[in-house]
Each structure stands twice: as structure tokens, then as C-alpha cells.
């Protein structure tokens, strides 16, 4: 079972602590004294799929030198302002990176392993995935 504890600090500023003891400060977007809760969801999705894709590429002997994921989301205008669409863009830099290995790693992450992105997808959020490979000599 996963657990989390949220503690109020001041105004709308809170600190969340994971069951593993890691903390993050959150706040409303208006106050901007911490990460917003909806931003946390995007960070979670980006982090989840990043860990998967990097692990899969390493297992397939891809020489990754740098890796970045950029996540953008569109939300509904009216409350509860849920995500309508989330776009995840992977940027992989390395030596002789295989297009097919990258595509397979992203597919495995987004369809089998990354519970965060699969949860959003199953809840009705439209998920889009793109990537670019920068091969360095």
C-alpha cells in the first residue's frame, strides 16, 4: 500500500511527504510558493515514464548521454478543470540511438508499465506521445 501525508504550513501552502520519506512543498498556483497539485500530477507522469524509458533503453544497450521529457497539458475551463489532453515529448541524445528501440521503450512505458500515464488515459484524458532523437558522433 502506498501512503502520503499532507501537512498545512500557512495560507494555502502545504508540504506533502511520501511514504518513503521524501517531501515536496505545494501551494495554489495563485500564491506560487510551491508546486501546484496539478503540476505534481504532470511531474509524476513525466517522472514515471522517464524512469521506464531510460531503464528499457539501458537494457537494450542504447548509449544514452542525455534524456529529457517535456510535458504539456490542456485543462477544462470549468471546475474541476480536469486534464483534457496531456502531451509528452521525449528528447533522447546519444550515440547510435535506434529509432525502433526508442519507439518500443515509449510504447512499453505508456501501455504496460507507467501506472501514472495509464491512470490518466483510463480516466479519459487524451494522451499524446512524441519523441526526437539527437545522435551525437
Task: Describe each region flagged by the PLM.
Residues 1-43, 54-137:
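Extended beta-strand/beta-hairpin segments
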Amino acid at each position: 500500500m502506498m501512503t502520503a501525508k499532507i501537512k498545512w504550513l500557512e495560507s494555502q501552502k502545504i508540504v506533502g511527504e511520501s511514504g518513503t520519506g521524501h517531501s515536496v512543498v505545494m501551494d495554489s498556483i495563485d500564491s506560487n510558493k510551491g508546486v501546484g497539485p496539478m503540476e505534481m500530477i504532470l511531474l509524476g507522469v513525466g517522472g514515471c515514464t522517464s524512469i521506464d524509458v531510460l531503464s528499457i533503453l539501458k537494457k537494450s544497450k542504447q548509449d544514452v548521454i542525455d534524456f529529457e521529457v517535456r510535458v504539456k497539458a490542456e485543462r477544462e475551463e470549468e471546475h474541476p478543470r480536469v486534464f483534457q489532453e496531456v502531451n509528452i515529448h521525449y528528447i533522447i541524445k546519444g550515440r547510435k540511438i535506434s529509432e525502433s528501440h526508442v519507439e518500443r521503450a515509449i510504447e512499453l512505458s505508456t501501455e504496460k508499465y507507467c501506472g501514472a500515464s495509464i491512470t490518466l488515459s483510463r480516466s479519459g484524458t487524451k494522451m499524446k506521445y512524441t519523441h526526437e532523437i539527437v545522435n551525437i558522433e
